């Protein structure tokens, strides 16, 4: 037997990979330790080169070829904390919506997009060379009856030229502290053709995509301001350079010319994803276009007043913008409020139930894990949902938000008010299928059915100390009267026949004296047995 030092013990941690990816995603949302900034069409995304190179062949070639991995930013030094000194990539050939969806996929292993944006995501995945996303998008488009778009030759050529130019610039080996590599001009992008509108299909999709309320890690560019004095060429070059001080490697600030000076780097705000929100309000300022300084403002005709008049892709893009980052001085009357609901279903990995709605899958998973994160501060009762806790708090505060419009009654729940309204309207929607008696409340009908009040026959009142009547077995019992019609109000006839049937089946013998007041249909001293009635008639 070997010594304890020679014995190797393997302790597996199955959740380590998912927890590690979750921590990286949290760092991306907060902007911590990000060593790369991706710019596209006026928007910026803070991210990590290692994560992108692990899931995209294009980024792997971009970061490793020509520079041996020591390219674009201070990835090997400790000065890239919080995004300071990070490298910059200009990827204008990839749209912001598709790029945001692919970045979220890289950090969460879940592709979140809309049906209308699926062709754009497929095109971006082809440019960035992400095979698994390409296969998934092709399968969904084919299953939905949509034709997959062919690759855009212009965008493919621009992506190839950018990769070659970047590899050439980083291979030149510019030392730290010197001027940045020569800017390699790229051909201007062609005017975008009119985008075809994808037809929505009613066929079921083969894959379940998670939909979240908002995209995280969107950085809204600041509003461009006119400086007090014109900037010289050197000042513009210094202002547009990122990571020139801090021990960065060669090729730190390489970016194709965009025609305008880059906005100064500063602290950026991030919007973490809140899974409990079922829907959220999107505030959009008409005077600022898509984003502050991100593009020309839209005309009132393009904005419109009807929600259907706005492109759903535009609404999905606006969902990534937080209202705190948009024009803080605007009044509420100048803001356009939009609500976006989830479209893609999600499947529970435990019970395989299909969950609809953003953020509802984590709430459903609490039914399997038993987690109850919402606790009452008064009595300590815990709940799995926040809305249930709010309803519970009404018991402590005495709040009754549902009031009757016809009387001063107030109720704790909406269904109590609905049942109460039947008293004013006279509706009796709950009907017994045996006697067709209607009730205003469902619990009244259930009580009626459990007690069998509709078929119960009482020939006379019986005291507690009376012996129960003797019922003969079914073999010796007399045949029940045939030909009874229980329809058209013949229920009383059936009850009378049933009473006579039990009287004939009862054993003969002296009647049991029942002291007390007589029945309502009997007179004082009246006979109570058939023998007595016959004796009186004969006399």
From Swiss-Prot:
Where are the stretches annotated Required for interaction with and acetylation by EP300? 344-400
Residue ranges with Acidic residues bias: 273-282
Q: Where are the zinc fingers (C2H2-type)?
A: 346-368, 374-396, 402-424, 430-454
Q: Which residues carry this modification: Phosphothreonine?
A: 369
Region of interest: Disordered: 171-308, 458-486, 501-539
**Where mainly found?**
nucleus
Which compartments does it reside in? Nucleus
An example molecular function term from Gene Ontology annotations = protein homodimerization activity
- Using the record's annotations, give every residue carrying the modification N6-acetyllysine: 206, 212, 335
This protein's GO CC annotations: nucleoplasm
Any single biological process term in GO: positive regulation of SREBP signaling pathway
Where do the BTB domain residues begin and end?
34-115
Classification via CDD domains: BTB_POZ_ZBTB7B_ZBTB15
Instruction: Give cross-link positions for Glycyl lysine isopeptide (Lys-Gly) (interchain with G-Cter in ubiquitin).
Output: 206, 212, 335
Annotated PROSITE patterns: BTB (PS50097), ZINC_FINGER_C2H2_1 (PS00028), ZINC_FINGER_C2H2_2 (PS50157)
Q: Which residues carry this modification: Phosphoserine?
A: 150
Q: Which SMART domains match?
A: BTB, ZnF_C2H2
Q: How does it assemble?
A: Homodimerizes. Interacts with NCL, NEDD4 and YBX1. Interacts with HNRNPU (via RNA-binding RGG-box region); the interaction facilitates the recruitment of long non-coding RNA Blnc1 by ZBTB7B. Interacts with HDAC4 and HDAC5; the interaction allows the recruitment of HDAC4 and HDAC5 on CD8 loci for deacetylation and possible inhibition of CD8 genes expression.
What is the name of the protein in this document? Answer: Zinc finger and BTB domain-containing protein 7B
Instruction: List the source organism.
Output: Homo sapiens
Classification from the root reads: Eukaryota, Metazoa, Chordata, Craniata, Vertebrata
Q: Which gene encodes it?
A: ZBTB7B
